[in-house]
């Protein structure tokens, strides 16, 4: 009986240890900064440990001026991105295609008027509108 009790505790301890191992939280990141005349430039960073192809990002009513092929930099595939919009990104939609349950996307936009926007896209909410009024 004594050995059975030890065995049960060891078995339960090992089972709990295996269950508590989690996947590393390593989200994709979109970082943009506003330039003159509705231009934005920044980085699209997608984790190298994600399953499948990198997710795609798109912007409503904006033209993509540049996006280089991704390069591995540390834990990320990094692409330089440049877009041109008729107006500010405020009030416009950003959409992601190809996010997974394990890969969310953090979005950070810095505007010329010193305001900024931070957002999160997930597989359940892959697109959102940047509000007209954003934080300082």
Task: Give the role of each language-model region.
Residues 1-8:
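Bacterial N-terminal signal peptides that target proteins for export
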Residues 9-10, 20:
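Cleavable N-terminal signal peptides
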Residues 15-19:
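N-terminal signal peptide c-region/cleavage motif recognized by signal peptidases
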Residues 21-136:
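Histidine-/acidic- and/or cysteine-rich, low-complexity loops and terminal segments associated
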């Amino acid at each position: 009986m004594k050995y059975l009790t030890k065995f049960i505790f060891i078995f339960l301890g090992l089972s709990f240890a295996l269950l508590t191992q989690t996947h590393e939280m390593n989200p994709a990141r979109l970082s943009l900064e506003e330039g003159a005349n509705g231009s934005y430039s920044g980085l699209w960073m997608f984790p190298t440990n994600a399953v499948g192809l990198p997710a795609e990002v798109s912007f409503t009513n904006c033209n993509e001026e540049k996006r280089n092929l991704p390069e591995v930099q540390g834990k990320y595939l990094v692409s330089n991105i440049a877009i041109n919009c008729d107006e500010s990104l405020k009030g416009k939609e950003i959409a992601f295609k190809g996010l997974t349950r394990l890969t969310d996307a953090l979005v950070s936009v810095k505007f010329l008027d010193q305001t900024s926007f931070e957002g999160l896209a997930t597989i359940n909410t892959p697109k959102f509108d940047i509000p007209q009024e954003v934080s300082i």
